[in-house]
Amino acid sequence: MKKVRLPFRLFCFLLCLTRCTSVMPGYIPVTPGNPDRNSLIECYFNLGLDYSEIINFLLLVHGIRLSVRQLKRVLFSKDLCRRKNHSDIEEVIAAVERELDGSGSLIGYRQMHQRLRVDYGLVVSRETVRHALKLLDPDGVERRSQHKLKRRAYSAKGPNFIWHLDGYDKLKPFGLCIHGAIDGYSRRILWLEVGPSNNNPRIVARYFMDCVKELGGAPRTIRGDRGTENVNIAAMQSFLRRNGTDSMAGQKSFLYGRSVSNQRIEAWWSFLRNNDTDWWINFFKDLRDVGLYCDDNPLHVECLRFCFIPLLQKELNRVAQHWNLHKMRPSLNQESPPGRPDVLYFLPELNGVNSYLKSVDDDDELLVAEELCCENHVMQADETFVELAQMIMNDNNLQIPRTPVEASNLYSEVLYHIESMI
């Protein structure tokens, strides 16, 4: 194998793993229709929604009318209860310890309780989780107790009134670029993707278009910075809103501004850093400090991406899902309503507001997507390099990593075998 072709082929292989699709994974069944009622109830219950939220989702999204008494009967028949039949304390401790080995070391007991409930299916009280964290991670509890964050006033009239999007570059020294979008009113994360670039306008445009197709419309306005990555989204948004009759139709529907003033998404990046990516930054710095990773070595960068992007994407999906399902407490800003982002976004009627989603017809979507978005096949890898990577993993019995440690081991193994071919 020629030395000059290896970095290029590695890059192609990486792109195969970094798919250019981006709507939040379908953890919540919001598609209208008439699926099995009891299955819907079980799904919403396991996501942590309370009785009134479950009933409202069933009625307003699925057209299923149910009383609290009927709901309780269904839950009883399925043996679903949050205050009885608590999980074994050893299972709880084991799950907490597993989370503390990763980014869970950054979160408090409320988020830890949510992870145990949603990801592990454990029935446990918040108080038990609080005591477990105090016992297993006293230093972390003390550090988090000193943290305070002051936010500026903000106003949005309803879901899809304004979306905020931005790139997150804290992991860029390691070849990992994150891009995300958040709804201004509900604070629901609309997409959160990691890949080799968040500056390619065609890739970022695909994130936006996938979200528009999933929701069936575009927002009233979008706010982003003047980076080159936003030029396609700005053109798409203006085109999709070209026939609007409101004051923000057409080109006015994309608002440019400095990244630091894009308040909603910038505040959420702070949350992401404190609750997830800070752990990953330190993890990758450790690889660099011991000489396993060199950020000016293209081979190291591509190998790190190959081994860690799928794992990190899974983690980001989990962080976004948990955020969208968590309950936000009342704040001094009356324009930021309390509640769960998912409930605020999908059921705005409960708070007396309307969704500002602007319907988009399929012809418009397809036309814009074809012109300004990357195609799925563009992000696929070179077949010969896929065969090379599979050969290395198969010949050496290397498994797809499930944890950061396993990904680190795979990184070392793949790097060793590829360098031996040069």
Language-model regions, residue ranges each:
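Major-groove recognition helix of helix-turn-helix-like DNA-binding domains
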Residues: 40, 64-81, 125-137
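Basic, amphipathic alpha-helix used for nucleic-acid engagement in HTH/winged-helix/SANT-Myb modules
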Residues: 7-39, 69-90
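Protein C-terminal end segments and domain termini
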Residues: 328-422
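RNase H-like DDE/DDD metal-dependent nuclease/strand-transfer catalytic core used by mobile genetic elements
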Residues: 59, 121-143, 148-333, 381, ...
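A short, amphipathic alpha-helix used for macromolecular contacts
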Residues: 30-59, 85-128, 165-171
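Short amphipathic alpha-helical segments embedded in low-complexity Lys/Glu-rich regions
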Residues: 115, 146-150, 338-341
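Positively charged n-region of N-terminal signal peptides that target proteins for export
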Residues: 2-3
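Short Lys/Arg-enriched helix C-cap and helix-to-coil transition segments
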Residues: 81-97, 141-153
